Regions:
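Short, solvent-exposed coil/turn linker segments
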Residues: 49, 137, 169, 177, ...
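Extended, Lys/Arg-rich, non-catalytic nucleic-acid recognition/anchoring regions
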Residues: 106-197
């Protein structure tokens, strides 16, 4: 801006308003800790869609629930997510089979090895059938082989088109040599590889595989030794659950593979409970995120209630965790079957969808879980009531309405002010928004002018929050108050280098129990 004006004319100048609006922070960023097919280990990676996840961490696997959970997260409306791959390396043993020859001495003919990973190859079948020899050329010998005939190999893999390799031979150098034809990288099989096992000196007739259908076996996937510390990790190395401390934008923590490790014998129940409590402790320490926990598999309502109340004793006084039951059935592309998995990944996606459509103040309940086929357990009304009282959020199937989440409680005590998920997450949102929006205050002169600006900015922000329906009250005076003055900042507080602002908020709470009183009346009667 010029200090003097010499030329006649109109001058338009920008003048700082002094207002620093507080913007709302994101509320739906999930962090997944678990097993994946590939990718960096113990290093957080951000993904925003399923394709990005596949490019970094691979596809679905048989020995982990994390890929299915993340797929369900995106399918249910999830957006940003952090993924931390934990655990040892996956050791894959391909399925294989030796095809027997026709010799009386039981000479093996061919070894068939699956190209599909691990146990997936166990579903491959190989059918051997004899074929007629081609007609003899004019003036020549029979087109059949003098020491053995030709055969057809049909390869069947579930969910794929059969592969047929006809007129095969075991004669070395033959254009239709079985090993060369099937193993051809361009025109050969996509499911198997062959290896000639017969020693030299054995006739073709004896080496030719016996005609029948064979099924491959022995395929498996296993993980090298896993200990709870692999899941828990530490902040310094940015590994495991503790490594999430370095990620400021995380609002949900999900670890479904704790249950997979338990099922596979890599963790005992004590280890499972210890890790779930470690996640709760992490969320309580960070005060800006909520843990979405899973119940163990195969438990009926009575068993899961006893487990939660007597065995696990999962409690979060500040409401920084939520527990869901039962497991859900989904399609598993890795096994090409339906499987039961922990619901936490799908739940995280539903939380995100609810935030996006209604706001973080809306309880993430009475909303449909997408991509879910069935439930491991169907609950009665009495069972639902008992579990709800003990802060176990249930998932129910409703005729004509799909499979829905039917609970919105945290792991806080029933009488706690942090009983509801939406209240806890609304306060997290408001706290983080004010924290980030008032960073400019640090080292400003601590006087009444500063207090007034802080009151103004926070009041404007909370007025917008109230306008979305997140706060209870017909007016802003009923919905909240902001106090930052001489009373909250006496001389001893100022001398200590502090500025104190007191904020009171009246959050909306869900209508958990809807009660209609209906009675008979006499026609024509008045109240």
């Amino acid at each position: 801006m010029p200090t003097t004006y010499q030329a006649p004319g109109v001058y338009v100048e920008e003048v700082p308003s002094g207002s620093r609006p507080i913007e709302g922070v994101g509320t739906a960023v999930a962090a997944f800790v678990g097993f994946t097919e590939k990718g960096p280990t113990n290093f957080p990676v951000r993904v925003t869609n399923w394709t990005q996840y596949q490019n970094t961490f691979g596809g679905f696997i048989r020995n982990g629930y994390t890929p299915l959970a993340i797929y369900g997260y995106f399918a249910n409306g999830g957006g940003n997510a952090w993924v931390i791959r934990v655990g040892g390396e996956v050791v894959s043993q391909p399925a294989a089979l030796a095809l027997p020859g026709r010799a009386a001495t039981a000479v093996d003919s061919l070894r068939v090895t699956s190209l599909l990973p691990g146990a997936e190859g166990n579903d491959i079948t190989v059918e051997v059938a004899d074929v007629e020899a081609p007609p003899a050329p004019e003036g020549g010998e029979s087109g059949g082989e003098a020491e053995g005939g030709r055969f057809r190999l049909t390869v069947n893999a579930p969910g794929r088109m059969p592969e047929v390799f006809d007129n095969l031979s075991l004669r070395r150098g033959d254009p239709r040599n079985a090993v060369d034809v099937v193993n051809n990288p361009e025109t050969g099989s996509k499911f198997i590889r062959l290896e000639d096992l017969a020693p030299r000196g054995v006739s073709l007739a004896e080496r030719r595989p016996a005609p029948q259908t064979y099924q491959l076996a022995g395929g498996s996937e296993s993980m090298t030794a896993l200990v709870p510390a692999d899941f828990q990790g530490d902040v310094a190395s940015r590994s495991g659950i503790e490594g999430l401390e370095a990620l400021d934008d995380v609002t949900m923590v999900v670890a479904p593979d704790i249950m997979k490790a338990y099922q596979d014998g890599l963790l005992d129940m004590e280890g499972v409970i210890g890790l779930q409590k470690a996640i709760l402790a992490h969320c309580m320490r960070m005060e800006d995120r909520v843990a979405i926990l899973d119940c163990p598999p195969g438990m009926n309502p009575t068993e899961v209630d006893d487990w939660k109340m007597k065995v696990a004793n999962l409690v979060s006084d500040g409401g920084y965790g939520a527990l869901y039951y039962p497991w859900i059935k989904v399609d598993d592309p890795a096994s090409r079957q339906t499987v039961f998995i922990p619901p936490s990944g799908h739940i995280a996606g539903l939380w995100s969808r609810t935030d996006d459509r209604r706001g973080v103040h809306k309880a993430p309940a009475n909303e449909e879980l997408l991509g879910v086929i069935d439930l491991e357990t169907h609950l009665t009304q009495a069972e639902l009531g008992n579990l709800n009282v003990h802060s176990i959020n249930c998932i129910r199937a409703f005729p004509g309405r799909g499979i829905r989440v039917w609970g919105a409680r945290t792991l806080a005590e029933a009488a706690s002010e942090w009983r509801y998920i939406n209240v806890r997450r609304l306060f997290n949102f408001i706290k983080e928004s004010i924290d980030q929006g008032t960073q400019w205050v640090v080292f400003e002169p601590n006087d009444e002018s500063l207090w007034a600006r802080v009151r103004r900015d926070i009041t404007a922000f909370l007025t917008r929050v109230w306008g979305t329906g997140a706060l209870f009250g017909a007016t802003t005076d009923e919905a909240f108050y902001v106090k930052c003055d001489r009373e909250t900042n006496p001389p001893e507080i100022i001398d200590a280098g502090m500025m104190v602002c007191e904020i009171g908020i009246a959050p909306v709470k869900p209508a958990e129990f809807v009660i209609f009183h209906i009675r008979q009346i006499t026609p024509g009667a008045t109240e």
